[in-house]
């Protein structure tokens, strides 16, 4: 039985990290694609030469033609311009929309049966555009956002409580931006909800509110520190977690930017929600109940995503 084929579209910092992680986890053979000649080939060769020490046999290939992604089981899209200090994810919309058109057409022509994970920002609008341009079924095109935002939330909580992050569960709803909704009520430490931990004196409501805000600002904090780009280790591990759930039919409950039609009162749009990922792609959207405050924050986030989608339609007439 042949190993799965994983196509990584974009050979920048995230793309290179994805390739290395996919190899170490032996998820399949990897094609690293980029329009810059030499970059994907050089990174693929470098990663392949780590195989003898790491102990993996995955085949690494660098490519500049979409023909090389033919038959891919998974495509992870990182192509596009990253954020610089002072930029919001939304500032990237005009530039990266053109990239999504090219990528979508490439996937449609050469890997129409793939499970596609989009990482390019502004995430919720770009994954919608990518699905439109590729024509793939909505359950097979998804955005990596919630896994990353939830990982940041979990990290901050584990530091605050001085417990293993393996015992912290948390997830984040809504768009991948300033309006994201870290759900305190549904987040726990070893099954104990965060509001109960406040009552137990483990932390204060003020500190919890600060952690929620720091989660919202998580990407911008790293952009500000790096000054020359944006995060790549945590985004890559988050996308690999999603790819592994699909390739191994793990039925993982993971928050991500998925097509929602009916759940949460929405009538067809991409936004961050809890989902189950298995061999069918997005197999289920988990329609959790929100209280009035959570619903208000979620509605605000949904409106922000709708604004981005409207902007895309204004830029690219074929999407209108």
UniProtKB/Swiss-Prot annotation:
EC top class named in words: oxidoreductase
| Superkingdom of origin organism | Bacteria
Q: What is its EC number?
A: 1.1.1.37
Q: Cross-referenced CDD domains, in alphabetical order?
A: LDH-like_MDH
Q: Which residues bind NAD(+)?
A: 10-15, 34, 96, 119-121
Write out the catalytic residues in the record.
Answer: 176
Please provide the record's keywords in A-Z order.
NAD, Oxidoreductase, Tricarboxylic acid cycle
List the catalysed reactions: (S)-malate + NAD(+) = oxaloacetate + NADH + H(+)
* UniProt binding sites for substrate: 83, 89, 121, 152
Q: Tell me the disulfide pairings in this chain.
A: none
Entry's Gene Ontology BP terms = lactate metabolic process; tricarboxylic acid cycle
> Molecular function (GO) terms listed?
L-lactate dehydrogenase activity; L-malate dehydrogenase (NAD+) activity
Among SUPFAM superfamilies, the record links this protein to:
LDH C-terminal domain-like, NAD(P)-binding Rossmann-fold domains
User: What does it do?
Assistant: Catalyzes the reversible oxidation of malate to oxaloacetate.
- What is stated as this protein's family in its record? Belongs to the LDH/MDH superfamily. MDH type 3 family.
Q: Which protein are we looking at?
A: Malate dehydrogenase
Q: What organism is recorded for this protein?
A: Cereibacter sphaeroides (strain ATCC 17025 / ATH 2.4.3)
């Amino acid at each position: 039985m042949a190993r799965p084929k994983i196509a990584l579209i974009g050979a920048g910092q995230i793309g290179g990290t994805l390739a290395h992680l996919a190899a170490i986890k032996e998820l399949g053979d990897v094609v690293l694609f980029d329009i810059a000649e030499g970059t994907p080939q050089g990174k693929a060769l470098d990663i392949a030469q780590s195989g003898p020490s790491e102990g993996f046999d995955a085949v690494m290939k660098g490519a500049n033609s979409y023909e090389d992604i033919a038959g891919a089981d998974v495509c992870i899209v990182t192509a596009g311009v990253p954020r610089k200090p002072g930029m919001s994810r939304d500032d990237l919309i005009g530039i990266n929309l053109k990239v999504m058109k090219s990528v979508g057409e490439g996937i449609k022509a050469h890997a129409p049966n793939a499970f596609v994970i989009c990482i390019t920002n502004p995430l919720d609008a770009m994954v919608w555009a990518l699905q439109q341009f590729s024509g793939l079924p909505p359950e097979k095109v998804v955005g990596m956002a919630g896994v990353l935002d939830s990982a940041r939330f979990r990290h901050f909580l584990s530091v605050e409580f001085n417990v293993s992050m393996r015992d912290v569960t948390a997830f984040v709803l809504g768009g991948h931006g300033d309006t994201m909704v870290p759900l305190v009520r549904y987040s726990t430490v070893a099954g104990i909800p965060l509001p109960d931990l406040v009552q137990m004196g483990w932390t204060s409501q003020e500190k919890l509110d600060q952690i929620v805000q720091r989660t919202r600002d998580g990407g911008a904090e790293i952009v500000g520190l790096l000054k020359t780009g944006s995060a790549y280790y945590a985004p890559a591990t988050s996308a690999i977690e999603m790819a592994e759930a699909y390739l191994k039919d793990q039925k993982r409950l993971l928050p991500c930017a998925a097509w929602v039609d009916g759940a949460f009162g929405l009538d067809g749009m991409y936004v961050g929600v809890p989902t189950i990922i298995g061999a069918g792609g997005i197999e289920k959207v988990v329609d959790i109940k929100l209280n009035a405050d959570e619903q208000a924050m979620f509605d605000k986030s949904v409106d922000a995503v709708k604004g981005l989608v409207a902007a895309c339609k204004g830029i690219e007439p074929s999407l209108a």
